[in-house]
From Swiss-Prot:
Function comment: Component of the protein machinery at the inhibitory synapses, probably acting as a scaffold. Inhibitory synapses dampen neuronal activity through postsynaptic hyperpolarization. This synaptic inhibition is fundamental for the functioning of the central nervous system, shaping and orchestrating the flow of information through neuronal networks to generate a precise neural code.
Localization in the cell: Postsynaptic density
GO annotation terms (biological process): inhibitory postsynaptic potential; postsynaptic specialization organization
Coiled coil: 30-63
Entry keyword annotation includes Coiled coil: yes
InterPro entries: Largen/INSYN1
Biased composition (Polar residues): 171-180, 243-256, 264-286
Subunit and partners: Interacts with GPHN.
Protein name: Inhibitory synaptic factor 1
Amino acid sequence: MNIRGAPDLGQPSDDPSSGGERERIRQRMKMVIGQLEGILRELKEVAKELREVVSQIDKLTSDFDFELEPDDWTTATVSSTSSSDKAGMGGPFDLGHLDFMTADILSDSWEFCSFLDVSTPSDSVDGPESTRPGAGPDYRLMNGGTPIPNGPRVETPDSSSEEAFGAGPTVKSQLPQRTPGTRERVRFSDKVLYHALCCDDEEGDGEQEVEEEEVGLPPEPAHTEAHAGPHKPSPAPYKSRRSPLTSRHSGSTLAPEQTRRVTRNSSTQTVSDKSTQTVLPYTATRQKARGKN
């Protein structure tokens, strides 16, 4: 027992067990160090291989000129020596000589886009040569520069139709251009409009002059352009149609026959202001009277 009265455990008895543990720890440390040394040797070998790979890459890329301006980067990426050489070897992916690989076109993106627009084969496949732009005459130059979506029109617009007094060239240019395949709406010709408006003018000119003399208006000159052609109706009947209405509003009394004539003229004037109307077959008034008899 020691001075404090505690039993002495005897340290010499613990030395063999502690020494064995130390030896095991030392052996494990040596083993770990050996593994680390092996890893370092492998890393050194990998570094040597990487140096060899870098040297081979330098040899392969020795003919490249990497000192380029920013504008020439697209040319370097598209038409590099390695890719162009492989494309020209005649392999399965050989596309032949490509015109857009030149530096002049690739230096400017707008020129490259214009090259693509010009060289697309869809222009020659979609339709015949007559439908290409520039193959035929420019129809927009006709009719005072007004764009005509369905081609040229031989007839000029009627003086009473809305095409002559309606929207000008600026409004028509804003409308979407229709293709020739979408002609669903009937386009009225000037002949139909002329027969719809002036069917009673030739046979009623004499009665109209008599009525104007009775009302007190000066007689109008004879209708000389009636035989010239149906494409150019004279605007004189429209003035005469308004004159009985004006005289009636002024307070003059008219005979029943004259009132019927005025009503017929006013209805004809109303028809002339409508551009969308159903096309009916023209039948002269004399033929209608014969059919009733």
